[in-house]
């Protein structure tokens, strides 16, 4: 018997309704879901992508983001920590904002460092944000675009500024050196195998942070922080046509990368036998077990297809039903686990996993994990019931209807992340109406208990 995933790949047909998804139209699982026309999506000649969206919810305000499709895994073994170090240097001088003039100017218009001006570096994605920007003068918009322009490829990266920041990041490393950080680093080899994901702790080591040559940081920046790996996302109370014109003008002088280095596709190797790791830490307050069932992720180019969305919906339904069971069991007297949860997690761009998280009552972790895993095995053998499916389906539909009815109340940040997920992962960027139509038909018309149980 073919699995549901195999059936999706071979092509199951769905009846989808709505503008662009009509009742007379049957879409194959390989069909692309319609994109929200209220988002202006474009690409500049230098390869930079952009997403612009008007949102009147926050009157007179806008969020400005630059997103990089790179992160710590682009570091070589001798560069561990450079991506995060660059995050700090974004605020330490650029072509048009020397020294700390950027922060001082932003504060002069009412923005706060750490709240409205911030950044985050991940394993495979990095972003820098300017949020709740007051659009009270046209010159403010021009300056925001100029900041994004400089972040794209015009950091000063002066030796004295780099040396000054070394101690700041070393102190951050010391502050983060808690039980969660240490346990996570030790567990990485078991989860990610012998890959870069297992050998990057985001911050680096104190020795490296204090001694690396500043030119190494400049070379890393020039190699990876380039327009073909970047996207600008701007959402707020502005005219999209005017913003697009300004964006194109400001970013026009950013050159196309010459001889760009290709991003390595990193795949997590399969293991012939189960990998088991026992990790202890004197500051760990709870006794936990995490169990991963890895699988290849849907390729990025297929993520905006009907089939990927349908598969994700079935996984969402199955994990929700499983978690209802766990919740009921945890309330029973004598249950060895305080909590248990099953969730789908994207480990990397190429690898997803079903993760079972178990927190024991006291230190009885073996009994707690055995109990939770036993329930998971029971579902694998005997499946869920129609009553369980109906309960979860009703809850998801209720939430979907509420999201559709309140779509006009979404803040800029929520709309920004829809664009970011489309850029980085190719997650469907659907309108609320299309999303609600798809949700209803997948749950109410197409999905069956047999399909979920065979997943």
Predicted regions and their residues:
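Bacterial N-terminal signal peptides
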Residues: 7-19
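Active-site-adjacent, His/Asp/Glu-enriched structural segments that form or flank metal-binding
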Residues: 59-60, 68-182, 196, 201, ...
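An aromatic/glycine/proline-enriched structural segment found at the starts
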Residues: 25-27, 194, 231-287, 394, ...
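Acidic/histidine-enriched alpha-helical segments
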Residues: 99, 103-107, 156-174, 239, ...
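His/Glu-based metal-binding/catalytic segments typifying zinc-dependent metallopeptidases
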Residues: 261-325, 357, 412-428
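Mature N-terminal segment immediately following signal peptide/propeptide cleavage
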Residues: 28-66
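Structured mid-domain segments that build the active-site/substrate or prosthetic-cofactor binding neighborhood
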Residues: 295-300, 304, 308-386
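Scaffold signal of the M16-like zinc-metallopeptidase fold and its non-catalytic homologs
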Residues: 92-94, 119-124, 144-147, 151, ...
């Amino acid at each position: 018997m073919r699995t549901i995933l195999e059936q999706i790949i071979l092509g199951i047909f769905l009846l989808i309704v709505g503008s662009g998804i009509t009742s007379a139209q049957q879409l194959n699982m390989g069909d692309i879901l319609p994109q929200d026309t209220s988002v202006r999506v474009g690409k500049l000649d230098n390869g930079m992508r952009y997403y612009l969206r008007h949102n009147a919810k926050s009157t007179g305000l806008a969020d400005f983001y630059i997103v990089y499709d790179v992160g710590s895994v682009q570091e070589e073994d001798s560069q561990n920590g450079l991506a995060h170090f660059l995050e700090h240097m974004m605020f330490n001088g650029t072509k048009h904002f020397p020294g700390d003039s950027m922060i001082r100017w932003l504060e002069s218009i009412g923005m706060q460092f750490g709240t409205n001006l911030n950044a985050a570096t991940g394993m495979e994605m990095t972003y820098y944000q300017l949020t709740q920007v007051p659009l009270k003068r046209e010159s403010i918009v021009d300056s925001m675009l100029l900041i994004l322009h400089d972040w794209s490829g015009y950091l000063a990266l002066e030796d004295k500024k780099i040396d000054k920041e070394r101690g700041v990041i070393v102190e951050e490393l010391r502050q983060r050196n808690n039980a969660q950080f240490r346990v996570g680093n030790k567990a990485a080899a078991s989860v990610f195998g012998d890959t870069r994901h297992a050998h990057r702790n985001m911050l680096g080591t104190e020795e490296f942070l204090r001694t690396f040559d500043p030119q190494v940081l400049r070379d890393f920046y020039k190699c990876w922080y380039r327009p073909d790996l970047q996207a600008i996302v701007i959402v707020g109370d502005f005219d999209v046509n005017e913003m697009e014109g300004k964006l194109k003008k400001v970013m026009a002088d950013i050159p196309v990368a010459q001889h760009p280095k290709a991003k390595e596709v990193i795949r997590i190797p399969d293991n012939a036998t189960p990998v088991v790791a026992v990790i202890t830490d004197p500051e760990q307050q709870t006794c936990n077990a995490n169990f991963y069932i890895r699988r290849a992720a849907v390729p990025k180019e297929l993520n905006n297809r009907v089939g990927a969305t349908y598969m994700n919906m079935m996984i969402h339904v199955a994990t929700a039903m499983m978690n209802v069971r766990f919740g009921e069991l945890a309330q029973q007297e004598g249950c060895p686990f305080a909590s248990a949860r099953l969730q789908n997690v994207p480990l990397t761009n190429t690898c997803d996993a079903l993760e079972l998280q178990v927190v024991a009552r006291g230190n009885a972790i073996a009994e707690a994990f055995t109990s939770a895993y036993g329930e998971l095995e029971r579902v694998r053998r005997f499946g869920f019931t129609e009553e369980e499916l109906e309960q979860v389906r009703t809850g998801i539909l209720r939430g979907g209807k509420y999201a559709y009815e309140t779509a006009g109340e979404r803040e800029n940040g929520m709309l920004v992340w829809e664009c970011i997920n489309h850029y980085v992962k190719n997650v469907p960027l659907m309108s609320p109406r299309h999303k609600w139509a798809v949700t209803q038909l997948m749950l109410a018309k197409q999905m069956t208990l047999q399909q979920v149980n065979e997943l």
